Amino acid sequence: MLRLINKTINKNDLIKINNSKRFCSTTTNSTINKDNIYDIIIIGGGLVGSTMACSIGNNNTTKHLKVALIESSKIQTVEQSISNAIPEIRTISFNNQTIELFKSINVWDTIKSTKRVNPFNQVRVWDTSGFEGIHFQDNDIIDDGNNTTAMGYIIENNIVTSSLLSKVKQFENIELFEQLSVKSMNDYNEETIRTTSILPSVTLSNDQQLHAKLIIGADGGNSILKKQLQVPSIGRVYNQKAVVCTLKLGIKQDNNNNSSNNNNNNNNTLFQRFLPTGPIALLPLANGYANIIWSTNLMHAQYLLELDDESFLEQVKDSFLKSPSTSNSSFFEIASNLFNLNPKGLSGNEIYLPPIEGLVSKRASFPLRIDHTFNYTLPRVCFIGDASHLVHPMAGQGVNLGMADVKTLSSIIEQSVQSGYDIGDAMMLKRFEEIRKPENLKMLLSIDTLFNLFTNNSIFVTGLRNFGMSLLNNISPLKNLIIGVSKGESILKFK
């Protein structure tokens, strides 16, 4: 598997975290205050960590387990998260598998009640070459038996997180530690934990010490837990930043977020264009708003952040609508005629974006990188979400991969309880890694390959790329396969 990674990622860009041996001294269980012993400690109360807590608390088999959820930030109520009519700049594209997970833990109705949920049923992807892009829409979607026609849902991060944490507070078995972080793992020792009955422990920023049969790291791409345990990972920095902001669109939507069907007055289409410096995406939000995620090189990102609002909006419009280069058109025409492909008219000057009224938020940016943890599990420790795998946001799959981790780990914990196993049993945790690592690696490598493909501007690569998009746009089964993956369906099958 690592050989596959090395083939995909440039070795010169690799970042390898030192894997030093974890030595320690450990407190014996007999000296522990029983009130501080938990079945599970979840570090990180963001989207993935809070969903993990809800999944345990809402399951009849596991709801008796004593859980500690540790979150370093101040927690918002649902009411606070919707108090500002303008959406926040951090938004997530949730696939249908994640929505089904939200339904199973009885939090989807709360999220929907905010009226800040926006489904999208079309995706338009193209580049600057002037040939053909890809158009996914409703009639490309195979009925999944759940009457689900939306390709996904764009929702603000804080809306979902506050809804999840509101649900967490309803569970008697879950204790929420707010505005506290993990200060120390108390000299965690793999060998001692593996071969004795001693439980691992964490010391919080208030010096409180907690012990657990299983510690779950869900504290994001800069995981403190992973750093303290010196868990090795492999990856690279893209030397890019994503510039994000919120726009107000010139469209009207009813209370159900339905908009006009006119080409330029529809807020249920996700637009993405691959520029020479990186992709820009317009994500449709509820109530006539949209989120911009513009991935670009460091110098250009700084330039975009320093522009005045009017100039920045002009840059956004030009990036989507500026006429493409036609220098390679002869190559495309030959390929199109040879394979009898029919371009769908997705060149930049034929895209109908919703009218943009203005910029309604500050602009922010965050660095982009790819990262994958070698080991998802240690004795009585498991990593999920961005703590174990980071991907480029261009495909919108980062959080969805984390939610798939939650679903798998929840199932394994349930099986452990049903079978009478220790929930921190190494064999059961290893099963989690065997299931999730191939899935996550597959998506991570696919997205990294796409990034490399779309940021390579040589004539040969550009020609192959556009020929591939044209071919894909004319083969329905292949389009359905890609839609299935984007909705969270697995190509790999496990017994």
From Swiss-Prot:
GO terms for cellular component: extrinsic component of mitochondrial inner membrane; mitochondrion. It comes from the Eukaryota. It catalyses: a 4-hydroxy-3-(all-trans-polyprenyl)benzoate + 2 reduced [2Fe-2S]-[ferredoxin] + O2 + 2 H(+) = a 3,4-dihydroxy-5-(all-trans-polyprenyl)benzoate + 2 oxidized [2Fe-2S]-[ferredoxin] + H2O; a 2-methoxy-6-(all-trans-polyprenyl)phenol + 2 reduced [2Fe-2S]-[ferredoxin] + O2 + 2 H(+) = a 2-methoxy-6-(all-trans-polyprenyl)benzene-1,4-diol + 2 oxidized [2Fe-2S]-[ferredoxin] + H2O. InterPro entries: FAD-bd, FAD/NAD-bd_sf, UbiH/COQ6, UbiH/COQ6_monooxygenase, UbQ_mOase_COQ6. Pfam families: FAD_binding_3 (PF01494). It is a peripheral membrane protein. SUPFAM superfamilies: FAD/NAD(P)-binding domain. Component of a multi-subunit COQ enzyme complex. This protein may be expected to contain an N-terminal transit peptide but none has been predicted. This is Ubiquinone biosynthesis monooxygenase COQ6, mitochondrial. It comes from Dictyostelium discoideum (Social amoeba). The gene is coq6.
